[in-house]
Amino acid sequence: MKLFVLAAIIAAVSSDRFSSQSQSTGGQTYPSPWQVGKQYRYEVTSRTLAHLQEGPSSGSAFKAQFTIRVKSPGRLQAKLENPQHGNFNEQLPDPRELPVDLKYQPTPNIDKVFEIEIDGGRIVSLDFPTSVPVPQENLIKGLISALQLDTSAHRVIHDSQNNYDREQQQGLFRKMETDVTGDCETLYTVSPVASEWRRELPKFANEQDPVEVTKSTNYGHCHHRVAYHFGVPVGAEWTGTAHKTQEQQLIGRATYSRILTGKEGPIYKAETTSTVHVHPHLYGKQKAEVYSHVHMELISVDQDSGAEWPRAGAMRPAQSILYSLSTKQMTKHYESSSSSSSSESHEFNFPEQHEHPHQSNQRSRRSYMRSKLVTVHKVLKKRNSESSSGSSSSSADSSSTYINDDIPDIDEPAYAALYMSPQPHADKKQNAMNAQKILQDIAQQLQNPNNMPKSDFLSKFNILVRLIASMSTEQLSQTSRSIETAKTSNNIIKSDMWMIFRDGVTQAGTLPAFKQIQSWIENKKIQEEEAAQVVVALPRTLRYPTKQIMTQFFNFARSPAVKDQMFLNSSALMAATKLINLGQVNNYTAHSYYPTHMYGRLTHKHDAFVLEEILPTLAADLKATVEYKDSTKAQVYIQAIGNLGHREILKVFAPYLEGKVEISTYLRTHIVKNLKTLAKLRDRHVRAVLFSILRNTAEPYPVRVAAIQSIFISHPTGEMMQAMAEMTHNDPSVEVRAVLKSAILSAAELQHPRNFYLSRTAQAARYLVTNEEFGYQHSFKFIDDSYDEDNDIGTFVISHIGSEDSLLPKDFKIVTNSKGGAWERNTIEASFSSAERFLDYLRDSVFAPHPKFDRAHKYSAEKIAKLLNIKNDEEEPLEASFYVDFMNNQRLFSFSESDLQQLSQYISEYMKKVESGAEKHYTKVYNQDQVSIMFPVASGMPFIFKYKEPAVIHFQSKLKGKFSFPSKDNKYYEANMIKDVQFTYAINIDGNVGFMDTLSNQYSSVGVVNKLQFNIPFKFGIEIKSGLIKFRVEPLHPDQDQTLVHYSVWPYSASQKKDSLVAISQDPATKIVERRSKVFSVDSKYGQSTHAVIYAQGYTYSSDWRNFGAKFTSRDYFTNLASLLTQEDIALTHFNLKHLCKQSQSKALTITAYYDEYYNQQNSGILTDATDRNDLSPNSETRRAEMVKLVSAGINKARVRVVDLSASFEGSQDQNYVLTGTWGDSPVDSKVQGMLFAGTKSATQGNQQINAVFATTKPEIHSLSFSKPLQSDLRAPFGMHFKYGQSGEIRVSGSFDRTKKYTTELENHPLAKQCSQQTTLNNFYQDSCHKAIVMAHAPDHVEFSVSFQDMSPQYRNFSYHTYRLYEYLGYWYTEANPLKLTQNGKMDFKIDFSYFDRTYTVDIASPSGEARMRDMPIATMAPGALSFYQPLKAYELVANYFTGHQYQPYCSIDGTRIHTFSNRSYEYPLSRSWHVVMQDESTQRGNWHELAILSRRQQRDQQEIYISYKSESGQDLEIEIQPASGDSAYQVKVTTNTKKITDDDLTMYWDDVKEQPFLQYHTHKDGVLVINIEDDRIRAIYDGQRFVVFTQDYRNSTRGICGRMSGEQRDDYLTPEGLVDKPELYAAAYSLNEENSDPKTQELKALATQQAYYPEYKYTSILRSDPTWQEESQSCGEDQWQSETVYKSRSYDKHKGACEVRQQVQFYENHGDICITTSRVPSCQSHCRAGDYKIQHVQVTCKSKLDHDFRMYKEQIKKGQNPEVSGIPSVKQFKVPVTCQP
């Protein structure tokens, strides 16, 4: 009985639900295409297929007869009859059509009777038999969607363009409509059909004209979306159309329907077509297409008088025709109001959209200018919305918080993530078994890298990941236990099984996988570095970052199981905070990166757990570490807090940035750098903070430069950009000026739409930037994005912060953003408090002992420091960090000084371990990028796009070595190591586009796989000795051929069974897309002559290879490299580079490099022509000695450098290649000579050699004069002789000259005029003169003749080949004259340089004709490269050009001016007091040199020099130099503990420890004394009146009148007592009150002491305002000024009278005040209305609401009284009536 009653209730409810749905909306009845009592029969066909632009199509088709019976209004019965289904994968004439011979099979479980509820032509709901599976249900929904025709006003979007004439049945309107693909905006058009419709509907040709209805869906505006997505790149639009500048169209999706229907029914024909276009590799021109077409055509319409079809058992309701993932009905949470026009996709705006809110304010200026109208009781305020930032403003929650499936439980796998099709929610028992089989298979494949591309290792790894992702916690735990035993196995294959499984679990991204990783760490299955590498990958692989998971992850990162493990502790904390940023704080990634369309937002947007739990905990941890002065941990916590990217981190960092909590400059810089994550959200607050720090010139420059690096990420406003451009002119810090210039100029070149605002603002400021040139060592930021409309390779950013104590940067960073990246990807950053100190510390820890100095010097550095009270700067703690974000690993390795001590100990321990033998086995498999997008198409089947970049690193090595450190017995470091290496790196770029045929469980797809693999299987040996490095390499497996490099591209079409365990490439049904002809192919062997055979084999069908050079057109190397791995024209490509070990007779290669220098060589004779050498053996001491002797012949006290390189191929028949070069010159001889020997020694090919000699004579050099070199000719003759073969030789003779034309140009150049002006003031070596002197020693004309004998014809036509080369390169200024010939065997060359025009011209005359290349470009630094100037070398002059004279800086003590190392020039003539030129008493580890240089003038034109120097090797010297008197030489007195070895024209003292000259000095021909201390460590030139010193050491540590050598001119005002502003005070402060000092100088010194002030840093306030200004800004701000509030008057008289204007005192309340008018104001009573209004200015007086009198006055006014008030008045506007009317 109970069952009967229950059945009756259910039937009643069901019938009531159907009967209550009438075919009307809002009382208006709409016609239905379905007439009661009729039966409609349709022919149904459906096809869905995938295809590339060429090649086979893969898909499926469905056909059936569809019968609809209308039994009552709004209720239909329907049934599919004879349903059939077929699959195909073949080449088709039309890729969208079906094969003619397609074979169909019956389709089960779909021919059941089901019911449809309609409202007019709109489908309301469905009832299915429970025996109908969900996949079949979705197919039916796709068919039913095609028949939906709703021309009613239901859910029409209000729009003025909407129109529909029901009588004429024509119109166009937009409405929200639900079909199987989603509830989205649909554009209806209703129109007549062309007369030819009868051909289309021959069976109904006699019926009245039908109407054509078309529908087009806008997927950018949906209230309910059925989709799954994960990992979608930032800015990639796939739901709709990319309209914003920062968006790119990733997927193009469209659904179009066409219906032919009678005016009152029936529907004769309905077609729905869905198309999806996407490039398999995300971006590119050649898109893949998934095409879905549903076709329904009416066969007959009959009267239906039969009984209803009986129900096929129990029924299952479907509340809508949306695609379903389960039988469970998911609730939709959205308003379906017809007036709704908000778009879900519009709710999640990019941060850039709000980055310039003032721009939108400008557009709405008029509305702001309008006066606001409020009542007198209430003041309304308008507030601008905040810019997007953090959790509060990135983007709003969607108005459609729908869900399509339940979020997986912590113990459940992610079913929807696999195919977005219904999955049985139960473990498959075979999963564990299949996973183990695949593990064994791919672990075995990993041992044979040659076959890895063919066996498709990486694709199989992703199959393993899929299996793991489908496991529950229990099943995964069981599987793990069975594999964990292999972890400690000595078997390589078993060990690889564990590591691959470990990485598979990491990449699965499911909650059970996360739980399993936690278990591993807690149970110490993985620890420290191994665990760290697993944990750091989780932020990019976890697919469901719920609040529970994020808090659990964070707490786990702080648990004892993690915190006590090295490497894991910091990595886990950063991974947890990065996940919290992606999943919660950054609302854009929280929506677009994770599957929110499937499950809704995974955490509530306004959940405060980040502010209440996460951030306070990290802030407390940071505070504690700072109090304990633990820099290492502090860096980690700063990085973790920065990772969160929430605006509230500014409050956490504020005390440290404001200086309230004392920390080092390095940590403050670290804080500012870690604001970048917040800056990426374009947060206005952080942008303001960064700009404030930048503008504060009292901040340390590293902090300011770090702010610049981040402010460009936040996209500064136009005003900020213009201010920064102006700062490039006047900012006191050269580092700030340099980085601003480089950043603005590179930002102006950006092309990607996402950088539109940044690029435009930079372009507007570009021309405001300074023309000052900055050195490469200064701070800079370079940004490049290689972009075109269809190809987005990525962004390349390189930046660094310059150092004051080194040319090495304090911070160096490279960032590459890939096209699939959401965060900064592939980031490498090294940061130091001082790079120089860091390297010195490491070096000293191993090599350098502290020297002891026994002898006291007259003026040692220590004594001078005491005399002048010079105190070394208080050194900040030594801190450093290395940050790497690579292979999905975000790692921070931070160091303090104590850590460096442990590091040196670790290195020592590792060396000891290596001596006994060390083995390493490492395997890492990961997905560098992965993107998944799935949604249904018209047929009711899910479209699936998956992009992955799986990669593997496999490394096995054995290392054994021996190390010898310097000792008493051996002064040199020696090492000998042997290492066996098997290294494999492989990556696939795998994009797959298709759909899941849910009827046959067949996955039809097309795709492209790019494969790249490197394999290094070699045994290496290295030997290091004094001056010798020997490197040996041999095959690890000499009996096997090895594939060293593999590259291939495979476009394919496939049809696979769902959950197939076979890789697509190995499936027999897969078809490769091929073309008819190859574009390029190679099949060649190289290296036969060396018996080491390299085989290059391959081919390509891609047109990209027709012009391979086009891939190298970008400004940066990263883009050029990335372009090699991508194809614009996708086509089959396959290349291999192999080492054929079996065919190679050479079994090993030994490379030897030897370098040595010989000093004071005295050999009589002259350099003769080149002759053959007798000794051709590698590394021959005999040959080197012979060549040293020959090259030094005739050179007085020659210094000879020798380089000996050799390569020996060892085997059954050795093959040796040798290259030996020697170079001889002398500081006291003008001759320069060189020799070169190149030879081969082969048992099969015999011995061959080429010998060459070179000789030139340097021109006369004038080191300190610009005018003297111009008065004499500059000429340097040279000659060369080459000998080759039996009788072949080449002889070259020519000269370098300076022409009169160039001399005249130089004399008239502005630089020369500046120098002349300085020279008249007795200043010969200021900046302008230095540059002019260098240019005066540069030749501008080179002319030489080449005569040859027995030269091959191809070399004789050199001029012709050179001409053709330049012509090919695009130099249009080339010309040839084949009639002007030289005699046979001779060629003439002329080269003319025009340095000021930056061009050069080449003339070549040869026996084959004359060629001339005119006005070709030349580098600006050419004069320095070609200059003969000494004592600087050519490479130093070039380096100085690129570093602003900071590579080899100089200081000159001139006649009346001093030029400092940092290029400051100031007026100061020396007095007879000793002045400190340089003083450095370095106590830094690794830098134990002590230096003091003093200078004074006893007479006006005579300067005396004193030098004290102590080296780290324990050698010391004192030099006292006095000017020459009359014709006598300079008086040089040297006191040293080293031995003098020469004492005539070149005096030399020898350092026995370093085996090199300790001191050299000589007088040059121009009368200048040249001094060289410790082999160019310090160089000086002196002519009795002026003294110039060159050195690149002592940066930022030296003191004296030559400045700090920091590169900052502002530092050259610092004296021992502080900063002074006058140059005479600065120089006098470094004078000594010794030896008859000058009284005037001492007076200046005393004055400097009085006026000196100490520099101090003043830190920046972080968004801080005083209360008064804050209050004033609220009441007097721009909004109030532009939109003054207008108050509306009213009468409070309660007695109704005639409607006339009454006078009434008014009041209003504003904030905490009561304001009352001082006079009565016109008003109307409440029962009257104003006839007209006017604005009247009225005086008001305001007092606090707490004021008793004003509260009383307010009550009186409300009673209609008019009290009189007094006080300070202000004027306000009131809207008052002119007349009052009833």
Curated annotation (Swiss-Prot):
* Assigned GO CC terms: cytoplasm; extracellular region
Q: What is its main location?
A: secreted
Basic and acidic residues compositional bias, start-end: 344-358
Tissue specificity remark: Detected in oocytes (at protein level). Produced by the fat body, where it is cleaved before being secreted into hemolymph. Sequestered then by a single class of receptor mediated endocytosis in the ovary.
* Region named Disordered: 333-367, 379-406
User: Where does it reside?
Assistant: Secreted; Cytoplasm; Cytoplasmic granule
Q: Which GO terms describe its molecular function?
A: lipid transporter activity; nutrient reservoir activity
List UniProt keywords, sorted A-Z: Cleavage on pair of basic residues, Cytoplasm, Disulfide bond, Glycoprotein, Phosphoprotein, Secreted, Signal, Storage protein
The name this protein goes by in its record? Vitellogenin
Q: Which gene encodes it?
A: VG
